[in-house]
Amino acid sequence: MPFVPKLVLFIFWLTVSSHLLAETISGTISDPSGALIPAARIEITGTDLSQPIVLSSDSEGRFSSPDLKPGSYTLRISRDGFETLVKTLELKDKLNVRLSLAISKPRVQVEVPGKKLPYANSDPVYRSLRSVGLGTTYSVSNATFSFDTATFQFQKGTLTFLSPVNGVVTGAVFIGEGHFTLKPATALDAQELKRRISASQVEEDFTEVILRFTAEERRKFFLGIGEQVQNPAEAAAALDRWKDRVRKRHEVAQSFTEQLLQGETMDNVDADLLAAVYNPAHPPFINAYIRGSKHKDLRYFIRTRVGALPQLDSPEEVALINYDPDSMEDGVWYLDHMGAEYQKGTASDEEDRRLFGTSSYKIETVISKNDHLFSQAVINFRPLIDGERVLKFGLLPNLRVMRVLDAQGQDLYFVQEGRKEDGSFYAVLSKAGEKGKDYAITVQYEGDKVLEKAGDGSFYVRARSSWYPNLNGFGERALYDLTYKVPKRYKVISVGNLQSESVEQDFAVSHWLTPAPVAVAGFNYGQYQKLELADEVTGYKISGYYLTELPDDLHNFQALRSMAPQSMTKYALDQTRAQVQLCTHYFGKSPFDRIYITEQPNFAFGQSWPNLVYLPISAYTDSTQRWMLFGNINASFNGFVQEVTPHEVAHQWWGHAVGWASYHDQWLSEGFAEFSAGLFLQQAVAGNWRKDYIEFWDRLQKRILEKNNFGISPNDSGPIWMGLRLISPRTENAYQNVTYAKGAYVLQMLRSIMYSPDDQDKAFIAMMHDFVDSHRDKPASTESFKAVAEKHMSKIMDLSGNGKLDWFFNEWVYGTQIPRYHMEYQLIPAEAGKVKLHMTITQSEVDDHFVMLVPVFVDFGKGMARIGQVGIAGNTTRTADVLLPEKPKKVALNAYKDILER
């Protein structure tokens, strides 16, 4: 499942010694008339290249390769509407070539955008913000400025305001001596800070602060300034360094903060300020970039309404980030609501953070024969607050916007800097819309890197949620009207229901509609064959799409090549049908009546969209086939294959039927889907299910508790509720192992303590149906799930005597304690042939307030059967007696690993 990122991958590049690669191939691409051709694809292969180099010609038809060794190279140049040109060159010195592409025979017409983009980055106010310089400077001495939980002490120095833009000052530069203090607003965030820096508050001396703010925040600085003085040279240099730093995008992130702040969805600060300049009532914000004595790039943000870190989907307004990708202290140090909200009792993770709400998208996409994408998206939206003119979209920076139009067909200004810059896409309305009224804009865009060829007929879909201008990510649901035009040998499988298919010359056209609003749109693409499977129990229409050829990186697996893809697909569809039936029984109906199971050319990655699932090739193999492939069974990989299909199918409920409110609550999606995979192993697998089921929970326990090379276990990295903030250089894979594995355990433990010998899972099933039904039209939060659980709790679960499950959620969601259990028992003959079971149970390695209900099992010769559960509090030992009808073969505590323990 996407995004937010689900797995964060850090790739480190080794620098190649420059004296080994000294030559380049450059040139221009033109048509027969001499007109230059932009966006032509140039693929270079040859001397010692382990993989092709792929370039695109710029708006002037120019291209230039990186440094190459001397030798023979083949250039393959392609562009939709032209014949492909293949040319071989001998590289001895630097080469500059002029290449001409012949116009191809008539085919489906694709409009190639013009070279000039007069409305791109051309809004006059935006241009002024982009080039803003220094204004007046004032001396500052022993001035203190407080912004929520943080205090800036400007002990000695100068404060230089930036020049006004449209009459508004949007920033300042402090040079001198100062001190920064941050005191967390809550105990939970103080604990998180202590885990990171071994201190419960932040203290940092600084010599430089760059401030960017809205007009309201600027007024606070006038209370502490002295007399006007000459601008210091250091201020101009500091501003230039700041511009260079925050405007640079890193395509391959080295750290979590680099991914957030300088990655694909990075902010364009000037465009954010443009929104505030155009709307005086824009939600106020302040960004402070602190050059400290110990930490050279601390960033303190206060952003009301939209959240301090929109890239993290954060409901909190206040953040402190240590941006230092090369340091072990890199990370999000602090993220919380404003202190005033806690004082008023108004702090909430469920506030609407959107500025605009989207009702529908109509997207027409053409994929050319060289995998280039051309699209037009009509986006229907309504303003949610007054006065806003600037809309920020999520869009892959390699997809270049060519034109933005309003509903009347008039061109609109838009912002999208270069691919390697702060190239996020913003549209600028010609005037502010009226709150609650419907509006529409049309966005035309094109580019590469949405698709990557994996083999003959197979592709990786890389830009999974950013292949179209997405206004609010997973934060809202909208209707989608999707039309795809692709080379006719290929097939698109999309979210929604297929409305029609046709062929236009060499292109296949398909039209899809979502019958109800969904959070995101996606598609799979390749040379697919189709197989269908009926589900008479749920009425679900299940379709499988499989590839007939292996991707290039799996060609060495000859055993896989010999397996029948259709029968392998039938295996995956059988698993899908079983999981659909199981989830429908336990959780209720999903919002969809069909599901498309599509093979993707990846061996170890799956993902779920609304009624569309990507499965890795490995999911199509059973244990016998995996033995044929590898000659042995790797327990970890075998576990992944067992879990991936039921996990991804379960996302039709967890993530799509029920969304999540913020990064704090993503465990309700990933953890619940992981739990559903375990439920599948227990309920839907014939034969000896106990072995696979117990091994599943053993694997999860190991993922939660096993320490990494820094001696830190995922569980010790922080509570589930911290979500993506668990990511740091020292904690490594903590986010995945806590959110997925411990999240699954939380739901399993609720199931365990709700279980009764008479009704078994009846109360749990009622709770899960209620949870799904009550959250079909709104995102779920940890607290809203807790409220549903409390409606269905039994008397034995009320360990605090107040009808609440605070004790459970404080321990397992907001806390990190995990108990250790030990049991000794005696079997004592009783009257009438019965046996008294005397148990001594010890709970340890927790505090005195920790309470839990632990299940007890006995085996009378037919396998372990549950006879009840024992409540125990703190580090203590308690005894209990139970009268049994006969002598058991064995007695065990927590026999099926229902409770997480050490």
List the predicted regions and their residue ranges.
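Short, acidic Ser/Thr/Gly-rich low-complexity loop/linker segments typical of extracellular
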Residues: T47-R62
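A short, solvent-exposed loop/turn motif at the edges and junctions
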Residues: D48-S50, R76-K87, D448-K449
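N-terminal, polar/Ser/Thr-rich
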Residues: P113-F374, N472-F474, D806-E811
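Hydrophobic helix-coil surface modules that form long, contiguous segments used
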Residues: A340-G345, D349-R389, G394-P397, M402, ...
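Amphipathic alpha-helical substructures
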Residues: I385, R690, S728-P729, A734-M839
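Beta-strand-rich binding/interaction modules
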Residues: R389-L391, P397-A407, Q760, N802, ...
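Zinc-dependent metallopeptidase catalytic helix centered on the HExxH motif
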Residues: Y460, L471, G475-E476, Y484, ...
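Acidic/His/Gly-enriched intrinsically disordered linker/tail segments
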Residues: E670, E674-M749, H775-R776
